[in-house]
A protein has these predicted regions:
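Short N-terminal amphipathic alpha-helices
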Residues: 47-52, 63-69, 86-91
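DNA-recognition element of transcription regulators
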Residues: 29-38, 61-83
Length: 121
């Protein structure tokens, strides 16, 4: 494995390979933080709107925007607590939303699968 690339595996749980190490994200993140990271990572580095995330996770909340902001803050903090990831910014704030784009080359297994499947159609 090339340590300058980050591999994200979503098909079998949620693991991240980086720097010669494999991290089972279920060991580091709460269920909600894990779900939020999954949704962001599935968007292939595209902006995910706040409205979409609030409707998906906090539809019945009295203050969904506050809940979203708190959970993004918490997710960023939890990721920084993993020693190998302390210098990587995973989640960028964009106008109207958030974008998952680590500052290293990232390969998500679901994106590879979609590309391979499209090639055989």
């Amino acid at each position: 494995m090339n340590s300058s690339k980050m591999y994200i595996h979503l098909f079998d749980g949620f693991t991240i390979e980086y720097g010669g190490e494999v991290f089972n994200m279920r060991d580091y993140l709460s269920r909600q933080s894990l779900s939020l990271l999954e949704v962001l990572s599935l968007q292939d580095q595209n902006n995910v709107s706040r409205d979409f995330l609030m409707e998906l996770f906090w539809e019945n909340s009295d203050n969904p925007l506050s809940s979203l902001k708190f959970n993004i803050f918490r997710l960023r903090k939890l990721l920084k607590e993993i020693h190998t990831f302390q210098d990587i910014e995973f989640i960028h704030t964009e106008k109207g939303g958030y974008r998952f784009q680590p500052e290293v080359e990232t390969i998500v297994d679901t994106s590879l699968f979609e590309k391979e499947f499209a090639a055989i159609e």
